[in-house]
Amino acid sequence: MLYFSSDYMEGCHPNILRRLSEINMDKNPGYGTDAICESAKNKIRAACGKPDAEVYFLVGGTQTNAVVIKSLLRSYEGVVAAATGHVAVHEAGAI
């Protein structure tokens, strides 16, 4: 069965867990300012074909959903989601 209530209910993909264990002891200056985030920004720019694009990382799904919804939807538009979807259950009133 597929569950859409929250991504916190599932474990991560084995490849992600493996990579996290490889870099677990690396020291980084802070979220968004390290070499891994800089590499990710460049990959996102390349995938979008926008080498000069500004790329920002947000710390959570609620903040990310709020930014995207505010940016893309007009005041009279809404989000269609599964009744058990995170945006419908855990973010009600937050966005």
For each predicted feature, which ranges?
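Buried hydrophobic packing segments
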Residues: 64-72
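Active-site-proximal loop->helix
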Residues: 90-94
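N-terminal amphipathic/basic leader segments beginning at the initiator methionine
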Residues: 1-19
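Conserved N-terminal alpha-helix of the aminotransferase class I/II PLP-enzyme fold
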Residues: 13-61, 83-89
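Structural motif
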Residues: 2, 54-56, 77-79
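Conserved PLP-anchoring active-site segment centered on the Schiff-base-forming lysine
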Residues: 71-89
